[in-house]
């Protein structure tokens, strides 16, 4: 998988990573000296198309906040979890931000993981003391590249869980009064046990630096996939786009270098054979023989136009391929309705990542709950990726339909919610409050006017009932016609 990750690493690292890997992606040309090659490298830039696509995909998946719902019908989520998701890693990161980073890593590399850890200390006698001590589970994001190995028991079945995972880590430790050093270590996770290995002396090799136990009967690691091939193995779904992104950077670098070289035309002299240097300025002349000639030579612009056209075509390919990859859309023309439906298609990358991310976060919550002896809430991600914001004219039209009685209050609020005008509205609660306010205003009216308002309300209710009856009658007639046709 490391070969597949190199293009992703370059896309993620941007211009700096592209230049550092110049021997692979911008190799030295024959007869090109070292200095010229270096100049060509440092003229190269890298456009972040692949990373932008991954960020946009994660933004669509998590454009609405993650919801925690009680697993008991009608129950409420414990305030403990509401506080936990405000700071899931001990550094003030919310669950939404953590999940967004996790989704981006999964989309880029094919999979990513979350380690659910707990402070190493003496266990508290109960949950109340634990909260007073500030002990709580925290999350650590693990990129796919950090997972260097895993193992199953030889006698285990294919569906049995992994019983050992090895993670590559780099930690910063203080050195002296002001300095610090980065130390590599290997974390080995097993059910109910963990160890950290560091390099000892040359004779010792890798030695156990830290070790401990956990209260969980499983390895506290949850994995989410975007391109799963096997357990802890995947293929980056954006790899074809990353390859195009690198080709785009190569062509752009060639064009920039060509323009740099061709920016100054070359002076050519015919019939001039005098040795020595030639001085060119406004106050100097060159004497040529009668058959001599002098002129500036520059490349034809058609070569640059062809190169620019190819670069533009690569940009269009990346855009089209990105849309088709994320939404499972065809490369050809589609109707607006088919594009809208494909956003929520169960086979689209957005849908796959969303489902797997929700399952992974649910496992994370279950393991965190097992640490503290509580019931975990249910994690809910919104699956509506169709971001279509209503314009002012459309809002006015819906308001007019509601005023004319063509749609109900609930329908109006639902359309405003879907159109991102009132994205977080609780429709049932809003309707209830509106009815209460209407009843309160009724009591403030003079008694002589209440009857007129009540009659108007009753008439409105009768009109709605008549409309429903007409709709039912029309449906029955349509059904009879279909039977006659059959």
Pin down the residues of each PLM region.
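Conserved aromatic-histidine-acidic binding/catalytic patches
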Residues: 33-41, 46, 102, 302, ...
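Surface-exposed assembly/interface segments
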Residues: 1-29, 155-179, 183, 311
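Extended, charged amphipathic alpha-helical segments
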Residues: 203-340
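Short secondary-structure junctions and interdomain/linker hinges
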Residues: 60, 64, 68, 91-98, ...
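Extended, regular secondary-structure scaffolds
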Residues: 106-228
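Short amphipathic alpha-helical segments
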Residues: 80, 90, 94-99, 106, ...
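C-terminal helix-loop subdomains that flank or include functional centers
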Residues: 285-287, 306, 313-486
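Extended, helix-rich architectural segments
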Residues: 1-139, 474-486
């Amino acid at each position: 998988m490391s070969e597949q990750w190199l293009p992703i690493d370059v896309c993620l690292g941007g211009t700096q990573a592209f230049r550092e890997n110049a021997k692979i992606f911008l190799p030295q040309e024959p007869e090109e000296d070292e200095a010229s090659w270096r100049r060509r490298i440092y003229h190269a830039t890298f456009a972040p198309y692949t990373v932008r696509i991954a960020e946009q995909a994660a933004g669509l998946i998590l454009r609405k906040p993650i919801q925690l719902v009680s697993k008991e019908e009608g129950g409420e989520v414990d305030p403990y979890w509401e506080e936990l998701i405000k700071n899931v890693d001990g550094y003030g990161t919310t669950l939404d931000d953590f999940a967004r980073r996790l989704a981006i890593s999964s989309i880029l590399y094919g999979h990513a993981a979350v380690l659910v850890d707990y402070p190493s200390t003496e266990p508290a006698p109960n949950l109340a003391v634990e909260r007073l001590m500030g002990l709580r589970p925290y999350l650590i994001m693990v990129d796919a590249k950090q997972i260097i190995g895993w193992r199953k028991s030889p006698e285990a079945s294919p569906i049995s869980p992994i019983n050992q995972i090895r993670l590559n880590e780099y930690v910063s430790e203080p050195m002296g009064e002001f300095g610090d050093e980065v130390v590599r270590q290997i974390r080995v996770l097993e059910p109910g046990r963990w160890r950290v290995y560091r390099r000892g002396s040359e004779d010792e090799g890798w030695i156990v630096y830290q070790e401990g136990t956990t209260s969980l009967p499983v390895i506290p690691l949850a994995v989410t996939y975007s391109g799963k091939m096997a357990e802890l193995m995947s293929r980056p779904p954006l790899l074809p786009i990353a390859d195009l992104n690198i080709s785009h950077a190569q062509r752009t670098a060639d064009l920039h270098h060509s323009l740099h070289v061709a920016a100054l035309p070359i002076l050519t002299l015919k019939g001039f054979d005098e040795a020595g240097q030639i001085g060119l300025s406004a106050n100097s002349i060159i004497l040529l023989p009668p058959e001599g000639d002098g002129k500036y030579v520059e490349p034809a612009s058609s070569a640059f136009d062809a190169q620019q056209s190819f670069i533009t075509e690569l940009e269009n390919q990346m855009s089209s391929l990105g849309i088709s990859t994320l939404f499972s859309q065809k490369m050809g023309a589609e109707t607006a309705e088919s594009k809208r439906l494909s956003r929520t298609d169960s086979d689209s990358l957005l849908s796959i990542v969303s489902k797997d991310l929700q399952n992974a976060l649910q496992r994370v919550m279950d393991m965190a709950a097992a640490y503290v002896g509580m019931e975990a809430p249910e994690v809910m991600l919104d699956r509506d990726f169709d971001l279509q914001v209503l314009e002012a004219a459309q809002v006015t039209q819906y308001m007019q339909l509601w005023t004319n009685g063509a749609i109900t209050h609930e329908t109006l609020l639902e359309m405003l919610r879907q159109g991102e005008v009132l994205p977080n509205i609780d429709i049932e609660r809003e309707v209830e409050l509106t009815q209460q306010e209407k009843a309160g205003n009724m009591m403030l009216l003079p008694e002589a006017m209440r009857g007129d308002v009540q009659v108007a309300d009753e008439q409105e209710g009768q009109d709605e009932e008549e409309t429903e009856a007409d709709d039912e009658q029309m449906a029955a007639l349509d059904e009879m016609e279909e039977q006659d046709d059959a």
